[in-house]
């Protein structure tokens, strides 16, 4: 059970006593680490009778090059500033540098939240 509330410990190390039990709106979900591979999407129920689409695996990126957008295939993750191990494991996050059929591109979307990979070409 993921909890998005405060820490049960104070800054001094003392215990903070809870005012109430965990509520459903305070809960979070496990992250989806989007990997390079054949496209697989997952829908997750979210608040307000809506659904989120999460990309579990994907091999396609929408790359913006000036005024036009190109669909390119993702070959692998070159660099990932959020975590160096993500580049080794081919995990795509926002800010990751991808090797694509059109050249190197930097991811501008959050594939674990939006379900698709948007990127811009890197010179």
UniProtKB/Swiss-Prot annotation:
GO terms for biological process: translation. Gene3D superfamilies: 2.40.10.310. This is Small ribosomal subunit protein eS8. The lineage of its organism: Archaea, Methanobacteriati, Methanobacteriota, Stenosarchaea group, Halobacteria. One of its GO terms (cellular component) is ribonucleoprotein complex. GO terms for molecular function: structural constituent of ribosome. Residues 7-26 have a biased composition (Basic residues). Part of the 30S ribosomal subunit. Keywords: Ribonucleoprotein, Ribosomal protein. Belongs to the eukaryotic ribosomal protein eS8 family. InterPro entries: Ribosomal_eS8, Ribosomal_eS8_CS, Ribosomal_protein_eS8_arc, Ribosomal_Se8/biogenesis_NSA2. Residues 1-38 are annotated as: Disordered. It comes from Haloarcula marismortui (strain ATCC 43049 / DSM 3752 / JCM 8966 / VKM B-1809) (Halobacterium marismortui). The gene is rps8e.
């Amino acid at each position: 059970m993921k909890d998005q509330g405060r820490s049960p410990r104070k800054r001094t190390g003392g215990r903070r006593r809870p005012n109430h039990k965990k509520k459903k709106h305070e809960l979070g979900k496990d992250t989806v680490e989007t990997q390079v591979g054949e496209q697989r999407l997952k829908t997750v129920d979210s608040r307000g009778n809506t659904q989120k689409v999460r990309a579990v695996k994907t091999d396609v990126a929408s790359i913006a090059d000036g005024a036009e957008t190109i669909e390119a295939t993702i070959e692998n993750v070159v660099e990932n500033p959020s975590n160096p191990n993500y580049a080794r494991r081919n995990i795509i996050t926002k800010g990751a540098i991808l090797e694509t059929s059109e050249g190197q591109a930097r991811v501008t979307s959050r594939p674990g939240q939006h379900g698709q990979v948007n990127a811009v070409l890197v010179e």
